[in-house]
């Protein structure tokens, strides 16, 4: 089958790889000059299935109000009055109760755990290297309340079968030696030993080369104007004066998916702006071993071979990609506070990207009412974590194979009022 994939980020490229391996003739189209040039370019670098959770959670609306008056707030909102933004925020607000949180987290952890298994298999089959490390993730707590919340929230991990270690502050240096110098600032941490790290852009670029060698065609520098449709099917992709035709079409345009699908399929994917710093390592012993998550500031600090990636924060500001100095100062503050000797911050590269976020946090993967249009978008801050699983899942569904995990509640159909999943999976409530 001829398949056209729109988008060459980590989700689009993994989709291309798995569809090609399933025997399909795949073409990837992107306006950029190469793969992973936008959202996948400089993300936090963590592959953390156990921490997969929606931003829409109990208590977030009240926290958002408090964050409005904080200099280093993890979330910022700038209202623009557009119906798109207001509707999305209202949908997110409706997901901030315990029942929805547990349903959404259950879906996300299921896909994220499966994705890690798919990445492990891909690594074994191809030998792909991307400065990866299987050193786990350590979530740091700065207050007694955060530590207390974690003791209750671990029931969620137990329900999903995710291994964990709850550590007091005195034990943090056992897994992250550089934290010995700052342990007095912390109350403890939650470690997930099975989590991984890696350079998402490097992975995507190398997998794209492997996919090209396997027969995938990449059409870079090719802006897409619109999808052409009639009745219940897509019949082409209009790119300038050219119409590219296929048997099936996959939307993996990230934050731009919603606009491209306007009038065809209504999906609630909104651009959630985030920032990162990439810092050269000065003293390896003063840098993190793997990934650190600062619970207070929602900042991730990840170790690559010779670099530290510091990423996080979320801004609901539409498609604005301005690099704001106060956001850089927040990233610098957190990394200086935890790893003062680790990196040469003055030489850091500052970056921003738009994460394609759904109001319930769960990506949109699967079929649509158009018989040859498929979606793989809306992964939010977890595109790197979920990419391989989403690509394999999409390939299986499109190819008529039975996927390894339940998937109907990942499709766009879940937003219908009459939707009932075939095999609903929910976690026992432990969120506070």
UniProtKB/Swiss-Prot annotation:
GO terms for cellular component: cytoplasm; plasma membrane. The gene is dadA. FAD binds at residues 3-17. Pathway: Amino-acid degradation; D-alanine degradation; NH(3) and pyruvate from D-alanine: step 1/1. Its cofactor is FAD. Gene3D superfamilies: D-Amino Acid Oxidase, subunit A, domain 2 (3.30.9.10), FAD/NAD(P)-binding domain (3.50.50.60). The lineage of its organism: Bacteria, Pseudomonadati, Pseudomonadota, Gammaproteobacteria, Enterobacterales. Pfam families: DAO. It catalyses: a D-alpha-amino acid + A + H2O = a 2-oxocarboxylate + AH2 + NH4(+). Oxidative deamination of D-amino acids. GO terms for molecular function: D-amino-acid dehydrogenase activity. This is D-amino acid dehydrogenase. GO terms for biological process: D-alanine catabolic process.
């Amino acid at each position: 089958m001829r398949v056209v994939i729109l988008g060459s980020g980590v989700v689009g490229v993994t989709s291309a790889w798995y569809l090609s391996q399933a025997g399909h003739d795949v073409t990837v189209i992107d306006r950029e000059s190469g793969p992973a040039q936008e959202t996948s370019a400089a993300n936090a670098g963590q592959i953390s299935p156990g921490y997969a959770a929606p931003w829409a959670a109990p208590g977030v609306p009240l926290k958002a109000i408090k964050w409005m008056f904080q200099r280093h707030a993890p979330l910022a909102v700038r209202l623009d009055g557009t119906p798109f933004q207001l509707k999305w925020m209202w949908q997110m607000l409706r997901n901030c109760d315990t029942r929805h949180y547990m349903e959404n987290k259950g879906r996300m952890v299921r896909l994220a755990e499966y994705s890690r298994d798919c990445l492990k298999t891909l690594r074994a089959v191809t030998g792909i290297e991307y400065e990866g490390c299987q050193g786990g993730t350590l979530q740091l707590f700065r207050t007694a309340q955060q530590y207390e919340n974690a003791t209750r929230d671990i029931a969620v991990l137990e329900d999903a079968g995710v291994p964990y270690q709850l550590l007091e502050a005195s034990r943090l240096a056992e897994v992250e030696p550089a934290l010995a110098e700052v342990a007095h600032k912390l109350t403890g941490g939650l470690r997930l030993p099975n989590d991984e790290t890696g350079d998402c852009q490097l992975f995507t670029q190398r997998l794209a080369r492997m996919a090209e060698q396997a027969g995938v065609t990449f059409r870079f520098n090719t802006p897409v104007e619109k999808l052409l449709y009639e009745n219940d099917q897509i019949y082409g992709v209009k790119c300038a004066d050219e119409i590219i035709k296929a048997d099936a079409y996959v939307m993996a345009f990230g934050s731009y998916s919603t606009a491209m699908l306007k009038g065809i399929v209504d999906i609630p994917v909104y651009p959630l702006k985030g920032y990162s710093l990439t810092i050269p390592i000065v003293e390896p012993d003063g840098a993190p071993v793997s990934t650190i998550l600062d619970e207070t500031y929602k900042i991730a600090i990840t170790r690559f071979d010779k670099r530290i990636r510091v990423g996080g924060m979320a801004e609901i500001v539409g498609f604005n990609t301005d690099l704001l100095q106060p956001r850089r100062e927040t990233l610098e503050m957190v990394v200086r506070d935890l790893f003062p000797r680790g990196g040469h911050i003055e030489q850091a590269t500052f970056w921003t990207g738009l994460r394609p976020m759904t109001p319930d946090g769960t990506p949109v993967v699967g079929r649509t009412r158009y018989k040859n249009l498929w979606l793989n978008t809306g992964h939010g801050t977890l595109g790197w974590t979920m990419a391989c699983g989403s690509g394999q899942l999409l390939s299986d569904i499109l190819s008529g194979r039975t996927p390894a995990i339940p998937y109907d509640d990942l499709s766009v159909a879940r937003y219908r009022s009459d939707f009932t999943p075939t095999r609903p999976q929910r976690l026992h409530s432990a969120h506070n």
